[in-house]
């Protein structure tokens, strides 16, 4: 691990991005101090985050999301040097120092480039020409650029992302460290004196690649302008010991410009760090940015450091109350990348050796270096940020106990706890929390809630795909357990409620439907008469009936039980929430009754997400909608089956519930009556026709008898009468009416 760390450190110090971005600084810095309050605002290079370094087309194609420009509020505290804000992200495969040195003073002030992020925070500081002269004075040789370009074009394997051979050892680490030190301290030569190089080099020569958190004495509050090196020198002092987390095994990791994480693993975590110590408000307005702006409070009793959230796979930001050691509680291993960083998955105990503390005379001679105690420790591709602040030493035990408790509760994995120092408990506020002290709240413009809540999200790169999960870890402090639980429940209801509701519905697929499943289970409702106030609510009726529909056909061996739990603020207002257990052997699939305000906009308290390893509980409204949809589909299915049964008389509908739609005796009787009445009418008409025909036939027969008698009397012969009957000419007028009637 030591060899690979040294190779990475050497590669970090020799990136060609450093050289080109430094030369870009010289051109863009002003030649004379600007006037008014708008000084320090300069346009940035359009290709500040994806400048070319050889063949970087692959890295340029990684930026797919538009850039987001973040600005501080104008009414906030006075801002310090824009060099405090020099940690942004470079190309997707570049290490942390490239982002530190590449994005310079003017590239942070205002964003005009495609992927650059600007800040309008330096409104009261003039940038003199001496800074540009210091930048030009500290140009490094072009041989380092050629070394890195050759390493890029040599086509190393992804397993060895350093690009250097085994021959380069800690000697090159020390050399590059010295170069970075001279370069970093030159940028603030006029404002603060550099720390001796022996002290700075000792920061990176520890065998554990760890840094010392030095606690200087509290200075006089004379620093309105502060030191511009507060975020430059420390990270560059840590330069060679940084084990190049950006050059991970997966070089195709897309670094999202809208998030701007400083570390690029396959999945990187970003954390809102909330350091609050002294009367100084550490103010970072960007969740994904590694920019820190040291703010001077209205009563500047002390100037403390602002933290830069260098996000690795698992970052930790700790506000140190004094000189102490970062234990392994917050040390991380990249568990989320077993395929790329398997060699680094050992718990690293960052043991920090103590450096000599500056005495009182040094404190007097270095009044502007009060904000330099910000050291970045990068171990195995992860970042740990420690911010020291002039507070009481007694808080050390408190933080150490919190770190140990964090390790016990939450094992070291993808998520980490970020404990905050002091007595500030604004971090534990939920989304409905309040801003207790505006000067001491570090809010994030990217986070959904700006009230001091810190979350940890995993960004999924293009190589990782969809195999990622978002975590939210909260540290309860000062007894704010209920608010933490409420925030955790909000996360559970927002991220996994839809999936869980679909899981509940999918469990109904292979189950047979009974009569009780298709109807409202009123008996289940009658058993709840112990709660008369709840029974009066229509929503409770519908939820109980829907719960019976959803939970009954799950497993024949699992029984559904109901039990009463604690009533909270108002016992008359209660809520039903369902928890579907994951284990079939467990006999309890319960419907928990919890008292909450009945307003639909309020937070519905849900059971703990990690409880019993079960499915996350459904929110009340979402569960109600899903159950209503299921019940509607079942009723439609019932009607379809009834219609099909009506078409085939042989099929029986006894398995279906008895309802007016199932029997339908009246429509059949009506149809038969109609048919009978029609038949009777037809029969009557036919009878009338028959009677009419009979009457006409009788008339015809009577006429024939009368004619025959006259013929007999006249002729006295029967032959004439016989011929007259069959002769149409003689009998035409006599037989014609009879013929028409018969037809």
Swiss-Prot record:
Feature: compositional bias, Polar residues: 81-102
Source species, domain of life: Eukaryota
UniProt keywords, alphabetically: Coiled coil
Homology family: Belongs to the CCSER family.
Coiled coil: 672-713
InterPro entries in the record: CCSER
Record field: transmembrane: none
PANTHER family membership: SERINE-RICH COILED-COIL DOMAIN-CONTAINING PROTEIN 1, SERINE-RICH COILED-COIL DOMAIN-CONTAINING PROTEIN 2-RELATED
Taxon lineage: Eukaryota, Metazoa, Chordata, Craniata, Vertebrata
Bias kind Low complexity: ranges: 29-56
Coiled coil in keyword set: yes
Region (Disordered): 1-125, 156-175
Protein name: Serine-rich coiled-coil domain-containing protein 1
């Amino acid at each position: 691990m030591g060899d690979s760390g040294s190779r990475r450190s050497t590669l970090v110090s020799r990136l060609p991005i450093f050289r080109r971005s430094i030369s870009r600084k010289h051109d863009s810095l002003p030649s004379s101090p600007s006037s008014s309050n708008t000084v320090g605002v300069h346009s940035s290079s359009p290709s500040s985050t994806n400048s070319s370094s050889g063949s970087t087309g692959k890295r340029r194609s990684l930026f797919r999301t538009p850039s987001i420009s973040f600005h501080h509020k104008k009414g906030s505290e006075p801002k310090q040097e824009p060099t405090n804000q020099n940690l942004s992200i470079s190309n997707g495969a570049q290490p942390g120092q490239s982002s530190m040195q590449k994005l310079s003073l003017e590239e942070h002030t205002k964003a005009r480039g495609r992927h650059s992020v600007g800040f309008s925070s330096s409104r009261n500081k003039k940038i003199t020409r001496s800074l540009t002269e210091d930048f030009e004075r500290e140009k490094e040789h072009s041989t380092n650029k050629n070394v890195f370009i050759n390493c890029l074009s040599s086509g190393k394997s992804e397993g060895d992302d350093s690009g250097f051979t085994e021959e380069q050892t800690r000697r090159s680490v020390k050399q590059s460290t010295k170069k970075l030190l001279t370069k970093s301290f030159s940028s603030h030569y006029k404002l603060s004196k550099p720390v001796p190089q022996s002290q700075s080099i000792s920061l990176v020569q520890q065998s554990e690649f760890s840094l010392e958190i030095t606690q200087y004495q509290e200075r006089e509050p004379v620093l309105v302008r502060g030191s511009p090196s507060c975020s430059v020198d420390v990270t560059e002092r840590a330069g060679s010991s940084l084990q190049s987390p950006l050059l991970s095994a997966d070089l195709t990791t897309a670094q999202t410009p809208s998030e701007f994480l400083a570390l690029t693993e396959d999945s990187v975590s970003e954390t809102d760090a909330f350091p609050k110590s002294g009367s100084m408000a550490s103010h970072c307005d960007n969740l994904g940015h590694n920019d820190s702006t040291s703010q001077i409070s209205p009563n500047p009793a002390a100037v403390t450091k602002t933290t830069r959230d260098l996000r690795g796979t698992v970052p930790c930001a700790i506000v140190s109350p004094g000189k102490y050691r970062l234990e392994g509680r917050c040390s991380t291993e990249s568990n989320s990348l077993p395929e790329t960083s398997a060699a680094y998955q050992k718990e690293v105990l960052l043991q920090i050796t103590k450096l000599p503390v500056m005495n009182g005379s040094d404190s007097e001679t270095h009044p502007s270096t009060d904000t330099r105690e910000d050291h970045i420790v990068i171990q195995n591709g992860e970042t740990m940020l420690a911010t020291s602040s002039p507070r009481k030493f007694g808080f050390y035990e408190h933080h150490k106990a919190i770190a140990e408790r964090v390790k016990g509760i939450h094992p070291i994995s993808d998520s980490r706890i970020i404990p905050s120092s002091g007595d500030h408990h604004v971090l534990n506020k939920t989304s409905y929390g309040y801003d207790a002290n505006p000067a001491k709240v570090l809010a994030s413009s990217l986070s959904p809630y700006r009230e001091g809540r810190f979350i940890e999200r995993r960004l999924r790169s293009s190589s990782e795909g969809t195999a990622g999960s978002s975590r939210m870890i909260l540290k309860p402090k000062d007894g704010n357990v209920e608010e933490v639980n409420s925030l955790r429940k909000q996360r559970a209801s927002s991220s996994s409620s839809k999936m869980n509701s679909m899981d509940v519905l999918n469990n109904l697929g292979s189950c047979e439907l009974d009569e009780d499943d298709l109807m409202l289970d009123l008996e289940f409702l009658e058993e709840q008469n112990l709660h008369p106030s709840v029974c009066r609510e229509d929503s409770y009726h519908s939820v109980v009936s829907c719960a019976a529909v959803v939970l009954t056909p799950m497993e024949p061996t699992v029984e559904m039980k109901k039990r009463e739990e604690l009533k909270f603020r108002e016992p008359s207002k209660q809520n039903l929430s369902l928890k579907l257990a994951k284990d079939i052997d467990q006999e309890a699939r319960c419907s928990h009754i919890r008292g909450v305000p009945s307003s639909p906009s309020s937070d519905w308290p849900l059971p703990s997400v990690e409880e019993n390893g079960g499915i996350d509980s459904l929110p009340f409204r979402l569960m109600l909608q899903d159950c209503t949809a299921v019940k509607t589909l079942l009723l439609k299915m019932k009607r379809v089956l009834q219609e099909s049964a009506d078409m085939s008389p042989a099929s029986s509908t006894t398995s279906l519930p008895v309802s007016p739609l199932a029997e339908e005796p009246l429509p059949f009787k009506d149809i038969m009556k109609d048919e009978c009445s029609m038949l009777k009418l037809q029969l009557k008409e036919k009878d009338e026709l028959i009677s009419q025909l009979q009457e006409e036939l009788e008339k015809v027969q009577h006429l024939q008898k009368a004619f025959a008698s006259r013929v007999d009397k006249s002729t006295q012969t029967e032959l004439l009468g016989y011929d007259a009957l069959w002769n149409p000419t003689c009998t035409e007028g006599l037989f014609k009416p009879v013929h028409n009637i018969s037809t």
